[in-house]
């Protein structure tokens, strides 16, 4: 079965599609150091988020993710969740993942695979820690029905 792909990216101009099919684009984060996006993921099994980091940047970033089963339904935290209870709810261990300049020392980007089975919508936002200028950061997303090598 061919992989279904959904892409959503920030920035100006066309995104760069790498050989491993992760979508990346360069984008200037807004003056308040935040970016938010919402992605419909119904029918997909996993979501890969990729963050490109500005070279020589000293900014630390926090990535928050939430999911919602349907329109108008409460958003729930999604990163680093504990085991689901009988009602399907999960305990949040940590509400965000933090990326520091040292995380990007050996690579241009960091990718995160997230299980999105049975979820309808995913919302994520990236927040800079501290004051600007924040430089450039790229945020890419790909959803599919089977894992890909990254």
Can you name each region flagged by the protein language model?
Residues 2-21, 29, 52-56, 67, ...:
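C-terminal interaction-tip segments
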